[in-house]
């Protein structure tokens, strides 16, 4: 192997991947432990899903997935988002469980080499978002984080595109100038 390439493999990590050591590793563990403590106090149970999934393409663009073949050469992907797997597992495999509040603290991966740690929670069978807001607020307060809440729903851009006869790519590509350029009186008043 070329000596320069060997040095890269010995010392560098791929762009987008994470390396924690010393103080940063300690801080990461403290954040995870405090978040888990607050979630458990609020009656959430922890779930750790497999790193690999057959279902990621249902919620993530295929080009963002890191894909492989399983034993039967069926496509699987590294987990790129925890929500879909947690909800799928909780509603299918754990449907008879009394637990309806789940949390997870685990890494997710996106193509080509992006790695982030996700702390998340899901409440099944409750349409109120207030329990979620309360728990998130408590976690943020614990870490001295002040935040503004933005509630989004994929149906909003879809409905706007339908009403204005626009392609969804306007939102996917962040091209709000297209909507503003329509010079709609009701929108101009906003």
Language model features with spans:
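Extended, charged alpha-beta segments that form solvent-exposed binding/catalytic grooves
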Residues: 2-23, 30, 34-190
């Amino acid at each position: 192997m070329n000596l320069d390439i060997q040095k890269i493999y010995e010392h560098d990590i791929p762009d987008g991947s994470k390396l924690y050591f010393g103080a940063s590793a300690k801080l990461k563990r403290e954040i995870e432990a405090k978040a888990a403590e607050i979630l458990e106090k609020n009656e959430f149970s922890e779930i750790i899903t497999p790193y690999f999934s057959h279902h990621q393409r249902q919620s993530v663009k295929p080009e963002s997935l890191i894909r492989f073949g399983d034993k039967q050469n069926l496509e699987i992907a590294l987990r790129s988002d925890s929500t879909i797997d947690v909800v799928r597992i909780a509603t299918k495999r754990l449907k008879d469980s009394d637990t309806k509040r789940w949390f997870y603290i685990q890494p997710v991966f996106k193509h080509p080499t992006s790695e982030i740690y996700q702390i998340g929670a899901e409440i099944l069978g409750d349409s109120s978002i207030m329990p979620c807001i309360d728990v998130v607020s408590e976690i943020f307060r614990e870490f001295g984080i002040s935040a503004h809440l933005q509630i989004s729903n994929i149906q909003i851009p879809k409905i706007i595109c339908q009403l204005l006869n626009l392609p969804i790519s306007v939102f996917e590509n962040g091209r709000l100038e297209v909507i503003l350029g329509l010079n709609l009186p009701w929108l101009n008043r906003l």
